[in-house]
Amino acid sequence: HYEPLESAVKNLISSQQISPVIARWDEKAREKTCNPLIAEGCIAATFGSEEAKDFPIICTTYRVVEHWQTGQMTRWLPWLTEMVPHQFVEISEELAREKGITFGDKVRLTSARNIEGVEAYAMITKRLKPFVIQGKTYHMVGTTWHFGYKGLVTGAISNDLSPYIGDANTMIPEYKAFLVNVEKA
């Protein structure tokens, strides 16, 4: 088992924190994120790093049924865009209370690669709960990856927050677990 490149916790199963053979894509990506085991000057909130303190919240991305893939096709269809017209971030009631965020507030998600961040609407939910790992409480947020800069509805591109790395064997991107911060916009 390896933890994601950006993990809030220490890997207790293996002495190797992250995969030693993660894949990086283009030159731009190499400048923005890399494997701290093999390169200097990485911009990633790896466990125990200074960046990890600035981005304490675990983030995941997911789909909604109203949009397909990145939304390139479905963001042009009025009946679908009416159902999900805005980029949103799902936030637990506990984290919302801690941050002073209410349902419908515009919030900014930031990461080690995107300190300007992306904006989305807060969706306060009971579906997410804080969890305790190794004796410490962690929060998690979730956001979709269907929005972009074209279409009847547009919105922040969530993948602008995530690392440009993936599994070396399958090349599957590591968009499902990374660290962010969330604040009112």
Whereabouts are the PLM-identified features?
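Long, contiguous, secondary-structure-rich segments that constitute the structural scaffold
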Residues: 3-27, 54, 63, 70, ...
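Extended boundary segments
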Residues: 28-65
